[in-house]
């Protein structure tokens, strides 16, 4: 998924506010499901974040175009671990440039029952979709 950095994404230094990288990653994960005409939840359960490891490299800034790349690191019965990286692929000037990494994260999601929040098996449909990443 690609997105552009807007004023609302930046801090007082003019670079992307650190928490927004997590928002970009969440949007990419959601967009993955939306493109399959599926919500990332069902009547029985929902994905919840168990843990996040985040690494910040070079800050992105206003007008740059970012590309969020997602890989499955581990897919188990009740959880999935995703590795997501964000690259700057275009400057605001629109001139050609070599992409560079700005952020990387490893996020562990559990699938839990909506009412009890107890872990339950990831539904077959979700496992099939995630396996295709």
From Swiss-Prot:
Entry keyword set: Hydrolase, Lipid metabolism
Disulfide bonds: none
Keyword Membrane: no
Protein function: Thioesterase that may be involved in phospholipid metabolism. Displays acyl-CoA thioesterase activity with lauroyl-CoA (C12:0), myristoyl-CoA (C14:0), palmitoyl-CoA (C16:0), stearoyl-CoA (C18:0) and benzoyl-CoA, catalyzing the hydrolysis of the thioester bond. Has low activity with butyryl-CoA and octanoyl-CoA.
Gene3D superfamilies for this protein: Hotdog Thioesterase
Known partners and oligomeric status: Homotetramer. May interact with CagA.
One Gene Ontology term of the molecular function aspect: fatty acyl-CoA hydrolase activity
Signal peptide (residue range): none
Active site (catalytic residues): 11
Pfam families in the cross-refs: 4HBT
Top-level taxonomic group: Bacteria
Name of the protein this chain belongs to: Acyl-CoA thioesterase YbgC
Keyword Signal found: no
Broad class of enzyme this protein falls into: hydrolase
Record EC number: 3.1.2.-
Family: Belongs to the 4-hydroxybenzoyl-CoA thioesterase family.
């Amino acid at each position: 998924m690609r997105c552009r950095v807007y004023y609302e994404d930046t801090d007082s230094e003019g670079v992307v506010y650190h928490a927004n990288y997590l928002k970009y990653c969440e949007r990419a994960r959601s967009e993955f499901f939306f493109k399959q005409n599926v919500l990332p939840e069902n009547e029985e359960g929902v994905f919840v974040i168990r843990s996040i490891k985040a690494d910040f490299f070079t800050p992105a800034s206003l007008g740059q175009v970012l590309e969020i790349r997602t890989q499955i690191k581990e897919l188990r019965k009740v959880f999935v671990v995703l590795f997501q990286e964000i690259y700057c692929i275009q400057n605001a000037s629109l001139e050609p440039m070599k992409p560079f990494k700005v952020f990387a994260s490893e996020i562990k999601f559990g699938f839990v029952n909506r009412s009890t929040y107890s872990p339950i098996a990831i539904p077959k449909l979700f496992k099939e979709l995630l396996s295709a990443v």
